[in-house]
Amino acid sequence: MASAGGCKKKTGNSRSRSPRSPVVLRRAMLHSSLCFLVGLLAGLAAPSDWPAAAGAAVFLRTLRASNVIFSRSSNRPQQPQLVVVVTTTEQSDDSERRAAGLTRTAHALRLVSPPLLWLVVEEAPAEKHAAPPTARLLRRTGVVHRHLLMKQGDDDFSMQISMRREQQRNVALRHIEDHRIAGVVLFGGLADIYDLRLLHHLRDIRTFGAWPVATVSAYERKVMVQGPLCINTSSSSVITRGWFDMDMDMAAGGERRAAADRPPPETLMEVGGFAFSSWMLWDPHRWDRFPLSDPDASQESVKFVQRVAVEEYNQSTTRGMPDSDCSQIMLWRIQTTL
């Protein structure tokens, strides 16, 4: 009985499983048929359609990405030009007076919006090629700077101040050219006093810019002003058309104006009265204008910059600053012991 009952249970289980096997078989056949149909349709399609479709998809994705990049870049504000201020220290061998002049310049440069780079050139003794006091002072100013040292020779003290100033400016030009520092270059000294508007207007210069400079002689009680005569052009830009000198004798209470509306010679166009774009230092088209046999033909020379500045002035491409008639003085040079 027990065995019979066990056989009955087995029979019942086999009967309950038997109806499910055809369902599983039908599902497998349906799945295989669908896969076969998809493969058949894929095989009937033209082979060249697949690369074209893939290439079109890649092109669309690239186009969408580029549109996103263009839209983001168009909304990004334009980066202002870098202002490079070169300060030479040839006028004072006294460290205290040199520190006073550098501190005064640093206070003005701290008020200028970035980007700004301050290049300070200083002579150092040959046996000790370092200037720690000046380096510490520059770090405390909070102005982005580079301290350039020039080896001091035995005959440097007997050299004229103008020649020492030119040598230091050549060191700064060589540094700008070697490192491809792109921006507007302004030469200055320890005795220069800047109006903040001048430093802001420098970013509008594309090639050369000029402005009036007032030289104050405290001992002779006299002020001499040199600068460009400017006109407005049809394109609403201010260009130079002449050069003027003005001597004002504070003791006599009068003034004398002479040599107006004339082109300036190279010796008159002092580099402290104009700024230039540094890209001209590595522009080969400008090098070819002057023979290499000429003295100071190198693009790293201040004389080269002066000659190019006079050439731009004669072509009436120099920008006059700061207003339509270039009448505002925004740079004063104090003739003192500094």
From Swiss-Prot:
Enzyme class: transferase
Any GO CC annotation of this UniProt entry: Golgi membrane
Residue positions the entry lists as glycosylated: N232, N314
Cytoplasmic topological intervals: 1-27
The keyword Secreted belongs to this UniProt entry's keyword annotation: no
Protein location: Golgi apparatus membrane
Keywords: Cell wall biogenesis/degradation, Glycoprotein, Glycosyltransferase, Golgi apparatus, Membrane, Signal-anchor, Transferase, Transmembrane, Transmembrane helix
Pfam families on file: Glyco_transf_43
Alphabetical list of Gene3D superfamilies matching this protein: Spore Coat Polysaccharide Biosynthesis Protein SpsA, Chain A
Region Disordered, annotated ranges: 1-21
Protein name: Probable beta-1,4-xylosyltransferase IRX9
Source species: Oryza sativa subsp. japonica
